């Protein structure tokens, strides 16, 4: 399962985990990706998408019009 948000484009990034003794270890930070079913009112159908938590908040505030435009392009 790829961990990339289709709306915001968020994906993994690399960084350091730093202990109390200031030891650095390389690690990979994953985005908070959720699999969601969203009702598209314009198309009268459900779609399954992988969205980040930030994208879910954007859709709840602005509606599904942006998501519908993005999915029609694919």
UniProtKB/Swiss-Prot annotation:
Gene3D superfamilies: Ribosomal protein L28/L24. Keywords: Ribonucleoprotein, Ribosomal protein. GO terms for molecular function: structural constituent of ribosome. GO terms for biological process: translation. One of its GO terms (cellular component) is ribosome. InterPro entries: Ribosomal_bL28, Ribosomal_bL28/bL31-like_sf, Ribosomal_bL28_bact-type, Ribosomal_bL28_sf. Belongs to the bacterial ribosomal protein bL28 family. This is Large ribosomal subunit protein bL28. It comes from Chloroherpeton thalassium (strain ATCC 35110 / GB-78).
């Amino acid at each position: 399962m790829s961990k990339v948000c289709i709306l915001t484009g968020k994906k993994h990034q690399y960084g350091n985990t730093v202990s109390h003794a200031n030891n650095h270890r390389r690690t990979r930070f994953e985005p908070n990706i959720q699999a969601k079913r969203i009702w598209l009112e314009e198309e009268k159908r459900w779609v399954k998408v992988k969205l980040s938590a930030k994208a879910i908040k954007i859709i709840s505030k602005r509606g599904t019009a942006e998501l519908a435009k993005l999915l029609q392009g694919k």
